[in-house]
């Protein structure tokens, strides 16, 4: 190790000069090994976030000492391994253009990674040999992904390879975990999310166990619709026996998930969905629990995620019961006796007798025919749901009718379930010409477009367009585990572009979450994201053709995503003027009018945007997750790579500006668990801006969601954060979200640790809620 090793890494050679105690670190350098020095610097993060930056640079230096010094050499060494994962075609492309790739790649950019980022890359994304030795650097991985996207087709597009590498390595965009895992390999399953619909026959029940296991082994996350499975004790005419219902089947999928881990890199990840009218609903709601009768008898399935597919009719009955306007009566059915309830939805929310409400009509038809197998109340169901949420943070809630009526692909078929993180909504079915939904994900770093004079909406639009083209190419270049997944992806060509770093944008511009300015900017950012994606998808359609299911879609009729919200009455028609004002004329009424006219001629992709969790991307780049507020100003992030201290650098910079980042403040911040609300030496304006997600009124999160949702083609992973498990508080935001037309009611509901006997249960809930659903996690 060179004499001035620490001084060099802390200097501006690798970016900005770091605010660290060099004398202290020089002494530590003498005493510690390199790995110990990394841990030592990480532990000092509480003093200043630059210590974490230095630890990251040390970790990068450590990796660079043990890996090849050029991209082509790294590929050659991997290809020479007896069990190399690299595809021969990929290796040939690298060798053919190695002079270009080797001269363009910039390994100094590795030093821009956060500590959490470089350790995550080492643990999960960088290719290893059969002995577990890392064989590449982060920049090599970014170039590998870029070549996979633009170098594996009929034409090797060098220009787009280099552009995509730049966008990835500068952390302007990120691609999903399966893309990072599998790009350039012999079996490149690049897709993140898969949606399966389980039919009520023995052959298909077991087929779906096999299919889910194969998908999971390639790194995909899975959402399964169970609403079509007949209820427990239902008669099976073919055998004369009685059905076991959904319980044993869920346990079977639970065991399959535990076995079929994602390439050994992380656990498998499945979510199961059920509609609320199903006779087995109370069994379903108890199966995730860590405590209770099923758990004690080991009849639960706590490793799965759970989701409810909630119709408007249930919410109407629940609201009436809450306000004593009705008795809350809710009928339960077995789908063999009351078929197709999960295959219809209400096109309108109106109470008018002539309203298009196919679900409501069929539901009450079956009630009149006395096909129901049980009667409960809406309150009883929601209380059972909440009891489970307290323990494990889910089941998620997806608003079935809003999802379907606002889908560009509503003409294809009813959307019966979502994916692992409830942001992907693709129709899927089994049987003749079965389709199993697939979506490829990526995200844009919103903080990359912060400028001294405001926000660069034009840059965001351009980046969104670039990601659109990337994902469209991934559809053609990826591996599909089943013919039904290939058929669906080729027919609809759905993509899901998300975001991360919204909280960083607000913090940098000194905007408070929940303020009118913040809500307007949230809307404008997602409008720009959608606009950029749609514009590029239209251009791609002119070049390559529209997706085959384009005829009959909303876009084919000149309806953009926000137009579907206007049609439903959930967005006022003047939204265009509001967006024009916020973007300072970047997006005007004319912009949207021209986009509508162009869309009628053809669109390449059936879906464009979906707001997923982005913990890994956020970890890698040092930005906050997706569209969420800061969860804390100081916390320990636990990942598969270890534990890391995360400090809110924007808060520290603001406090340093007024000479308040002192040892006393540091100690108070530590003792308060990352909250500054009771540190009265800090000005009220700063305390207000740095309220954490738990400290702000949860209606703020709902209002922000309502502002961005009209520009989301699919849905979003919308979390809520509460101090105490009070059903009234949770119901308030759920009902508000439903009334505002949200597609996702809730992803996870997080609760702070409580007191007494509840404390352990809620701590378990926190553990479950914070577990990374990394299949669609970026």
From Swiss-Prot:
Signal peptide: none annotated. Its EC number is 1.17.4.1. It catalyses: a 2'-deoxyribonucleoside 5'-diphosphate + [thioredoxin]-disulfide + H2O = a ribonucleoside 5'-diphosphate + [thioredoxin]-dithiol. GO terms for molecular function: ATP binding; ribonucleoside-diphosphate reductase activity, thioredoxin disulfide as acceptor. The keyword ATP-binding applies. The record marks 200, 230 as: Allosteric effector binding. It holds the Pfam family Ribonuc_red_lgN. It comes from the Viruses. Induction: Expressed in the early phase of the viral replicative cycle. Keywords: Allosteric enzyme, ATP-binding, Deoxyribonucleotide synthesis, Disulfide bond, Early protein, Nucleotide-binding, Oxidoreductase. The record marks 747-748 as: Important for electron transfer. PROSITE patterns: RIBORED_LARGE (PS00089). The keyword Transport does not apply. Under complex allosteric control mediated by deoxynucleoside triphosphates and ATP binding. The type of nucleotide bound at the specificity site determines substrate preference. It seems probable that ATP makes the enzyme reduce CDP and UDP, dGTP favors ADP reduction and dTTP favors GDP reduction. InterPro entries: NrdE_NrdA_C, RNR_lg_C, RNR_lsu_N, RNR_R1-su_N, Rrm1. One of its GO terms (biological process) is deoxyribonucleotide biosynthetic process. The record marks 193, 439 as: Important for hydrogen atom transfer. Disulfide bonds join 193-439. The record marks 773, 776 as: Interacts with thioredoxin/glutaredoxin. SUPFAM superfamilies: PFL-like glycyl radical enzymes (SSF51998), R1 subunit of ribonucleotide reductase, N-terminal domain (SSF48168). Heterotetramer composed of a homodimer of the large subunit (R1) and a homodimer of the small subunit (R2). Larger multisubunit protein complex are also active, composed of (R1)n(R2)n. Belongs to the ribonucleoside diphosphate reductase large chain family. Ribonucleoside-diphosphate reductase holoenzyme provides the precursors necessary for viral DNA synthesis. Allows virus growth in non-dividing cells. Catalyzes the biosynthesis of deoxyribonucleotides from the corresponding ribonucleotides. This is Ribonucleoside-diphosphate reductase large subunit. It comes from African swine fever virus (isolate Tick/South Africa/Pretoriuskop Pr4/1996) (ASFV). The lineage of its organism: Viruses, Varidnaviria, Bamfordvirae, Nucleocytoviricota, Pokkesviricetes.
């Amino acid at each position: 190790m060179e004499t001035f090793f620490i001084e060099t890494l802390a200097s501006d050679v690798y970016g900005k000069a770091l605010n660290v105690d060099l004398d202290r670190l020089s002494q530590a350098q003498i005493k510690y090994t390199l790995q110990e020095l990394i841990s030592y610097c990480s532990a000092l993060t509480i003093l200043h976030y630059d210590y974490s930056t230095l630890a990251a640079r040390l970790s990068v230096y450590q990796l660079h000492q043990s890996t090849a010094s050029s991209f082509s050499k790294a590929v050659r060494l991997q290809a020479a391994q007896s069990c190399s994962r690299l595809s021969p075609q990929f290796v040939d492309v690298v060798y053919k253009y190695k002079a270009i790739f080797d001269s363009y790649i910039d390994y100094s950019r590795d030093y821009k990674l956060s500590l959490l980022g470089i350790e995550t890359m080492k643990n999960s994304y960088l290719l290893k040999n059969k002995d577990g030795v890392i064989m590449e650097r982060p920049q090599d991985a970014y170039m590998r992904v870029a070549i996979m996207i633009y170098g594996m087709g009929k034409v090797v597009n060098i220009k787009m390879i280099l552009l995509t590498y730049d966008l990835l390595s500068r952390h302007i965009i990120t691609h999903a975990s399966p893309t990072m895992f599998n790009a350039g390999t012999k079996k490149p399953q690049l897709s993140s999310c898969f949606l399966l619909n389980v039919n009520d026959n023995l052959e298909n029940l077991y087929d779906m166990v096999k299919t889910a296991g194969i998908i999971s082994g390639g790194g995909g996350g899975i959402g399964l619709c169970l609403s079509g499975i007949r209820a427990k004790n239902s008669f099976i005419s073919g055998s004369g026996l009685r059905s076991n219902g959904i319980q044993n089947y869920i346990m079977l999928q639970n065991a399959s998930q535990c076995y079929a881990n994602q390439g050994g890199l992380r656990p498998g990840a499945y979510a199961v969905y059920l509609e609320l009218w199903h006779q087995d609903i109370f069994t379903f709601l108890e199966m995730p629990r860590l405590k209770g009768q099923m758990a004690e008898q080991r009849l639960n399935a706590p490793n799965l995620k759970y989701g409810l597919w909630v119709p408007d009719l249930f919410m109407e009955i629940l609201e009436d019961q809450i306000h004593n306007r009705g008795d809350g009566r809710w009928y339960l059915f077995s789908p063999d006796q009351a078929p197709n309830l999960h295959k219809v939805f209400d096109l309108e929310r109106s109470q008018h007798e002539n309203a298009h409400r196919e679900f409501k009509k069929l539901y009450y038809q079956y009630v009149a025919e006395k096909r129901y197998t049980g009667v409960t109340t809406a309150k009883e169901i929601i209380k059972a749901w909440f009891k489970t949420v307290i323990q494990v943070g889910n089941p998620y809630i997806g608003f079935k009718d809003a999802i379907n009526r606002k889908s560009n692909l509503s003409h294809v078929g009813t959307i019966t379930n979502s994916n692992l993180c409830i942001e992907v909504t693709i129709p899927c079915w089994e049987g003749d010409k079965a389709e199993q939904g697939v979506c490829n994900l990526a995200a844009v770093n919103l903080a990359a477009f912060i400028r001294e004079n405001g926000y660069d909406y034009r840059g965001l639009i351009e980046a969104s367009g670039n990601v659109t083209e990337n994902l469209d190419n991934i559809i053609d270049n990826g591996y599909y585990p089943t013919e039904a997944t290939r058929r669906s992806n080729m027919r609809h060509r759905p993509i899901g572009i998300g975001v991360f770093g919204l909280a960083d944008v607000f913090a940098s511009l000194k905007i408070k979450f929940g303020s009118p300015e913040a809500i307007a900017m949230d809307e404008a950012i997602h409008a720009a994201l959608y606009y950029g994606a749609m514009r590029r998808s239209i251009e791609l359609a002119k070049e390559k053709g529209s997706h085959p299911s384009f005829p009959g879609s909303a876009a084919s009729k000149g309806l953009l995503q926000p137009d579907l919200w206007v049609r439903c009455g959930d967005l006022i028609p003047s939204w265009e003027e509001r967006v024009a004002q916020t973007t300072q004329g970047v997006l005007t009424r004319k912009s949207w009018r021209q986009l509508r006219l162009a869309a009628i001629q053809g669109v390449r992709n059936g879906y464009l945007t979906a707001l997923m969790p982005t913990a890994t991307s956020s970890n890698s780049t040092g930005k906050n997750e997706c569209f969420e507020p800061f969860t804390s100003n100081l916390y320990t992030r636990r990942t598969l790579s270890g534990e890391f201290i995360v400090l809110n650098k924007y808060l520290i910079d603001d406090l340093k500006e007024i000479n308040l980042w002192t040892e006393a403040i540091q100690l108070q911040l530590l003792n308060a668990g990352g909250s500054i609300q009771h540190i009265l030496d800090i000005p009220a304006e700063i305390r207000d801006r740095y309220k954490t997600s738990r400290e702000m009124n949860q209606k703020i999160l709902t209002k922000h969601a309502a502002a961005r949702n009209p520009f989301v083609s699919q849905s979003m992973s919308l979390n809520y954060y509460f101090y105490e498990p009070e059903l009234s508080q949770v119901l308030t935001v759920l009902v508000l979200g439903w009334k505002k037309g949200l597609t996702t009611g809730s992803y996870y509901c997080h609760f702070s640790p409580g007191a007494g006997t509840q404390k352990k249960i809620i701590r378990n809930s926190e553990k479950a809620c914070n577990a990374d659903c990394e299949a669609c996690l970026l």
